[in-house]
């Protein structure tokens, strides 16, 4: 089952991206390096619901 998740910047706590994942095949939380427009640099984004 695919669920919608938000990706939140780890340094400034702004929610920048919306994505989905399959919770059966990937039960752990997602950690992705993405661009943060507020900080204007690439930062670590963590899964939040």
UniProtKB/Swiss-Prot annotation:
InterPro entries: Ribosomal_bL33, Ribosomal_bL33_CS, Ribosomal_bL33_sf, Ribosomal_zn-bd
Example of a GO cellular component annotation carried by this entry: ribosome
Keywords from the named record: Ribonucleoprotein, Ribosomal protein
The keyword Ribonucleoprotein appears for this protein: yes
GO biological process: translation
GO terms, molecular function: structural constituent of ribosome
Family statement: Belongs to the bacterial ribosomal protein bL33 family.
Protein name (Swiss-Prot/TrEMBL): Large ribosomal subunit protein bL33A
Organism: Streptococcus pneumoniae (strain ATCC BAA-255 / R6)
């Amino acid at each position: 089952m695919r669920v919608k998740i938000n990706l939140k910047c780890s340094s400034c706590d702004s929610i920048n991206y919306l994505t989905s994942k399959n919770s059966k095949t990937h039960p752990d939380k997602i950690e992705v390096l993405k661009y943060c427009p507020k900080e204007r640099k690439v930062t670590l984004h963590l899964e939040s619901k």
